[in-house]
Amino acid sequence: MVTSPEFERGIAEFNQQQFYACHDTLEAIWVDAPEADKRFYQGILQVAVGCYHLSNDNLRGAIILLGEAVRRLCDYQPDYEGINVEQLLEQAMALLKALQQLQPEQTSDFWQQLQKQSGATNKEYNSDSLPDLVASCQLPYINRVLN
């Protein structure tokens, strides 16, 4: 399988939690993609944008985008374009389920705890406020399928 350098860059941006940059990179691919691939790219884009919304305390936007992403990516399981779609979906669904249990005022604390859990930040947070929800999920990460 051959993937474009732009696709590789978008995946790297996603995995570095540069969700807005990932959106820009993959959107350029999505626009010109064959019809059969559009939903795949759009699904990954929506996971990225959902995480971006979460990072900006937009709980409703995160829930909507992650839900749309799950619907779009489910047809591409278990893997597609060298991506472990099944694992990405599991992570996105676990995050979506946790977000659906949050109140809007908990969004910032939840995001900080997710980042702390993933090692992305050293910010202090109230570790007692949402431990079960944070333990039940993680920020999605795109893994390659090993052939």
Name each region found by the language model.
Residues L99-N147:
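A hydrophobic membrane-anchoring alpha-helix module
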Residues A12-E13, L45, Y52:
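Residue-level signature for tetratricopeptide repeat
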Residues C51-N56, E90-D109:
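Alpha-helical linker/edge segments of TPR/alpha-solenoid repeat scaffolds
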Residues L59-Q77:
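TPR/TPR-like (Sel1-like) alpha-helical repeat modules
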Residues L45-Q46, P78-Q100:
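TPR/TPR-like alpha-solenoid helical repeat scaffolds
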